[in-house]
Design a protein with these regions (language model features):
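Extended repeat-based interaction scaffolds and adjacent low-complexity, acidic/S/T/P-biased segments
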Residues: 2, 6-7, 14-21, 35, ...
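Short, internal active-site loops enriched in acidic
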Residues: 71-76, 111-114, 197-206
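A solvent-exposed, charged loop/short amphipathic helix patch at secondary-structure junctions
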Residues: 148-165
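Accessory, usually C-terminal, subdomains that scaffold auxiliary metal cofactors
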Residues: 185-234, 248
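Aromatic/basic-lined ligand-recognition segments
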Residues: 78, 82-144
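C-terminal edge-of-domain segments
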Residues: 108-133, 219-256
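Generic N-terminal amphipathic, Lys/Arg-enriched alpha-helix
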Residues: 27-37
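Short, well-ordered alpha-helical segments
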Residues: 47-72, 77-87, 160-192
Length: 256
């Protein structure tokens, strides 16, 4: 994920990563990224239908979709996560978003601890729109405390299975570093963010000031979701974005 690629059909750059998502996206000059959040989680199939309608109503091609934020009922096993990802990616392929098995779409996928959806659902999505004289906009994919690569997530996770205050701090430090790495590759930093989100059921207060605020990650505040990363055994996830347009839609019914 060290080389920034271009996805011309969508008018954005991206950081190549794994087959189910990229590391982050940034709009081309002359375009910006718009985020649309569903008021309530929408089941995956219905969500894709809603996204198709919203994007087409905006006069944009489906290839303009550049990020998805998902909510799942509970953390997956490695095998279950792989099966879910294959189903999810199938729609992206139909929309012309996957080229030679390279996925340019950013993503986060987390599991609310309280009142989760019954099925995997959409929380929000992003797509590019034409824009004049706006600051560059971007979305960084969610990352937990496990490096991308081969082998199981448990083999790659920071202090896997540990939930002490010290372990959660170390996991957070790793994830913050990964956010900074992805931001830097796309030409951004914390000062460019307008939203930073944390996903964990563990207490962040012991390291909030010195690990998060002090490094500039909370300049626009923080949104803490009481949720788990999408894989069993992972405890801490973050994502971030720098956007001007952030809307809420009432299209589609809730996933309950």
């Amino acid at each position: 994920m060290s080389i920034v690629s271009e996805f011309t059909p969508g008018s954005y750059r991206f950081l190549p990563s794994v087959f189910q998502y990229c590391g982050g996206v940034a709009a081309f000059t002359g375009f910006e990224i718009q985020r649309v959040r569903f008021r309530n989680p929408v089941p995956l199939g219905d969500g894709f239908d809603c996204i198709k309608e919203i994007v087409r109503d905006a006069g944009r091609p489906l290839t303009a979709v550049c990020a998805c934020e998902l909510r799942s009922p509970a953390p997956f096993t490695d095998e279950g996560f792989r099966a879910f990802n294959q189903s999810y990616v199938a729609t992206l392929q139909k929309w012309g978003l996957i080229d030679n098995a390279v996925n340019p779409v950013a993503r986060s996928n987390v599991c609310p601890k309280i009142n989760p959806p019954k099925v995997p659902s959409f929380h929000a999505f992003c797509f590019t729109v034409e824009a004049i004289r706006v600051k560059p906009t971007f979305v960084i994919s969610g990352s937990g405390e496990a490096a991308e690569g081969s082998g199981s997530y448990s083999e790659r996770a920071v202090r896997h299975g540990e939930t002490s205050a010290d372990a959660i701090r170390e996991k957070a430090r790793y994830v913050l570093g990964e956010m900074e790495r992805r931001l830097s590759l796309l030409g951004f930093g914390w000062s460019d963010t307008t939203a930073v989100q944390i996903y964990t059921v563990h207490d962040i207060h012991p390291f909030l000031a010195d690990e998060i605020v002090q490094r500039g990650a909370a300049q626009s505040g923080l949104t803490w979701h009481y949720a788990r990363p999408p894989l069993r055994g992972l405890e801490y996830e973050m994502d971030c974005a720098g956007l001007r347009l952030d809307a809420v839609t009432d299209m589609c019914g809730p996933a309950r």
